[in-house]
A protein has these predicted regions:
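Membrane-interface micro-motifs in multi-pass membrane enzymes
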Residues: 36, 124-174, 199, 322-356
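Hydrophobic alpha-helical transmembrane segments of multi-pass membrane proteins
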Residues: 96-104, 137, 157, 194, ...
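Transmembrane helical hairpin unit
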Residues: 293-406, 410
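Transmembrane catalytic cores of multi-pass membrane glycosyltransferases
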Residues: 27-88, 92-98, 153, 196-339
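Transmembrane alpha-helical segments
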Residues: 105-117, 165-177, 207-215, 288-294, ...
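Intrinsically disordered, polar/acidic, low-complexity terminal segments
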Residues: 5-73, 86-128, 223-224, 366-487
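Alpha-helical transmembrane segments
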Residues: 9-23, 130-137, 187-190, 230-238, ...
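Short hydrophobic alpha-helices at membrane interfaces in multi-pass membrane enzymes
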Residues: 175-194, 226
C-alpha cells in the first residue's frame, strides 16, 4: 500500500496544481481589455477590421514597433506582442489571456526542471513532476498582483510571459549542455533575439547566467563553450539593440534615474527584505514536502559539486538581486506589481535551489565522517516530526486565513459573489455604445462593479489624454473619455 501511494504521489501533486488553475482560467471568461491593450492595439485592430489580412496586420505591428523604438522604448519583441494584443482580433480571444499566461509559466517551470532532474541529477520522472508541480503551485497561488500578472494582457505578457520564455530558453540551454546537439543552436539564437527585446528584469539574470556558464566551460576547455558563447553574444547584442533605442532616452527623461552603484546597493538591500517577507508559511510547508524528495535524489549524486555552499549561495543571491537593478536604476523603486511578481517567481526557484544545495552539502559532510550511514532518509521519528510540523503549518494557514489569499480562492470569491458576471455585463453594455456608428463623441460612465483580479483600471477622464485618443481611434470615434464627475 505504501509503495502504491509513493508511486501515485507525484500525480497527486500534479492534480492539485491543475485543479487550482481551474477557477483562474474560468474567471478569464469575464476578462476584458483596458488601457494599453487598446493603446497599442489600435492600428493593428483597424487594419485587421479593414483587410482581414494577417500579413498586413503583422506589417502594421512592425510599423508600430519601429515608431515606438524611436519615441518610447526599445523592447522590440515585447512591443511586437503588445501591438498584436488579442483584442486587436477579437474580444473573445482576450478571454484566453489567462490560460495562455498560466500555460507558459507552468510549461516553463516543467520544461526547465526536466533536464535538471532527469539528466544532470539522478531524479525520476515522478520526482521531476513533484518538484515542478509544487513550485508551479507556489508561483501561481501565493503571488500578489494576480490581476497584472495573469489577466491584463499588456502587463502579464510583458513580465510573466517573458519570464516564462526565459525559463524555456534556459531549459533549452541545459538540454544542449547535456546532449551537445548543435541543432539546438537555432532555437537558442531565436530565444536570445526574442528575449533581448523583452523586459530587462528577467533578462539581466538570464544574461549573467548564460555568460557564467560560458566562462566555466571555457575554463574547463569544453567544446560546448563555443555554442554557449555564440548564444551569449547574441543575447548581449540583442539587449544592446534594445537598450540603445532613442525612445528609451525619451521615456527615461520623465523618470527618477539614479547612479548605477546606488541601484546595485539598493537591490542588494531589497533582496534581504524580499527574503524575509517571502520565506513564510507556504515556503516552509513546501520545503518540508520536498525534503524527502531532495534527499532521495542527492544520495544518488556525487557530492563533490556541493562543496562550496557559501560561494553558490552568494552567486544565487546576486542573480536574484540583479532582477531589481533595472527597476531601481530607471525608477528608483521596486517597480509595479507585475514586475515584483516575476522577482517573486525567481525567489522561489532560486531559494529552493539553494535549499537543495545546502542539503547536498550537509550530506557531503555526513558521508565524510568515519563509518557514515549507508542511507540517510526522512523516516521514523524524524518523519513523524516532519508530518507534525506540516500539520501545524496547515493549521496556521487555515487559522490565519492565509489560504483565502491564494489566487484560486480569490477567483472563486469573485465568481461566486456575482461581481465578475456583473462587470462583464457592464462591459458588454459599454461595447454596444462604443460600436454604435451613430455615436461619435462618447462619454462613458465608470464601472460600478470592479472585481478583484480582472479589473485593472478604467480609461482616463480626459478626452485629450493619449490613451483616450487611442481608444477613440480604436473604435473610430471623434472623442472618448470616462466621466468621473458623479463619483
Amino acid at each position: 500500500m505504501k509503495n502504491n501511494f509513493a508511486k501515485w504521489k507525484p500525480y497527486f501533486f500534479l492534480a492539485i496544481l491543475l485543479l487550482s488553475l481551474i477557477p483562474l482560467i474560468w474567471l478569464g471568461r469575464y476578462n476584458y481589455p483596458t488601457g494599453d491593450d487598446y493603446y497599442y492595439g489600435a492600428e493593428t485592430h483597424l487594419v485587421w477590421q479593414q483587410t482581414g489580412s494577417i500579413i498586413q496586420t503583422l506589417d502594421a505591428a512592425c510599423a508600430g514597433v519601429a515608431d515606438s523604438y524611436q519615441i518610447w522604448q526599445g523592447t522590440y519583441s515585447a512591443l511586437f506582442l503588445m501591438y498584436l494584443a488579442p483584442n486587436a482580433f477579437s474580444n473573445t480571444a482576450y478571454h484566453l489571456v489567462t490560460f495562455v499566461i498560466l500555460l507558459l509559466l507552468c510549461g516553463g517551470i516543467f520544461y526547465l526542471l526536466c533536464p535538471l532532474f532527469r539528466r544532470f541529477l539522478p531524479g525520476t520522472c515522478g520526482e521531476w513532476i513533484t518538484v515542478s508541480s509544487i513550485l508551479s503551485f507556489l508561483c501561481i497561488q501565493t503571488v500578489e498582483f494576480q490581476c497584472d500578472s495573469f489577466y491584463w494582457y499588456n502587463g502579464s505578457m510583458y513580465y510573466t510571459g517573458f519570464f516564462a520564455v526565459t525559463l524555456f530558453f534556459l531549459g533549452t540551454l541545459f538540454r544542449y549542455l547535456d546532449n551537445g546537439k548543435r541543432i539546438l543552436l537555432l532555437p537558442l539564437l531565436l530565444f536570445a533575439v526574442f528575449l533581448g527585446g523583452g523586459n530587462y528584469v528577467s533578462l539581466l539574470p538570464c544574461m549573467l547566467l548564460s555568460v557564467t556558464i560560458t566562462l566555466l566551460l571555457l575554463l574547463q576547455k569544453n567544446k560546448k563553450a563555443y555554442i554557449c558563447g555564440i548564444t551569449s553574444v547574441v543575447l548581449l547584442l540583442s539587449f544592446a539593440v534594445s537598450a540603445m533605442a532613442p525612445g528609451n532616452h525619451v521615456r527615461q527623461s520623465g523618470m527618477w534615474k539614479i547612479p548605477a552603484w546606488k541601484a546595485i546597493a539598493k537591490c542588494l538591500l531589497q533582496g534581504i527584505r524580499y527574503t524575509f517577507a517571502w520565506t513564510g508559511l507556504w515556503w516552509v510547508l513546501a520545503a518540508l514536502l520536498l525534503l524527502p524528495v531532495f534527499l532521495r535524489i542527492l544520495q544518488k549524486k556525487n557530492g563533490a559539486f556541493f562543496s562550496h555552499p557559501i560561494l553558490f549561495t552568494g552567486y544565487a543571491y546576486g542573480l536574484f538581486c540583479s532582477m531589481s537593478c533595472p527597476l531601481f536604476y530607471t525608477m528608483n523603486s521596486t517597480g509595479p506589481g507585475r514586475a515584483v511578481a516575476i522577482v517573486y517567481y525567481m525567489f522561489l526557484l532560486i531559494s529552493f535551489t539553494v535549499f537543495f544545495y545546502w542539503i547536498g552539502f550537509v550530506l557531503l559532510k555526513m558521508q565524510a565522517r568515519p563509518n557514515p550511514p549507508e542511507r540517510i532518509e526522512v523516516s521514523g521519528k524524524l518523519n513523524t516530526a516532519r508530518y507534525l510540523a506540516m500539520a501545524v503549518l496547515l493549521f496556521s494557514i487555515l487559522c490565519t486565513g492565509l489560504w483565502q489569499e491564494t489566487s484560486a480562492m480569490k477567483a472563486i470569491r469573485v465568481l461566486t459573489d456575482g461581481e465578475a458576471a456583473a462587470y462583464a455585463a457592464e462591459y458588454e453594455d459599454r461595447l454596444l455604445l462604443l460600436n454604435d456608428p451613430e455615436v461619435t463623441d462618447v462619454v462613458l460612465t465608470p464601472f460600478i462593479h470592479q472585481p478583484a483580479l480582472i479589473y485593472t483600471g478604467d480609461l482616463p477622464g480626459d478626452p485629450e489624454d493619449p490613451t483616450s485618443r487611442k481608444v477613440a481611434q480604436y473604435f473610430q470615434k471623434t472623442s472618448l473619455y470616462v466621466n468621473y464627475g458623479n463619483n
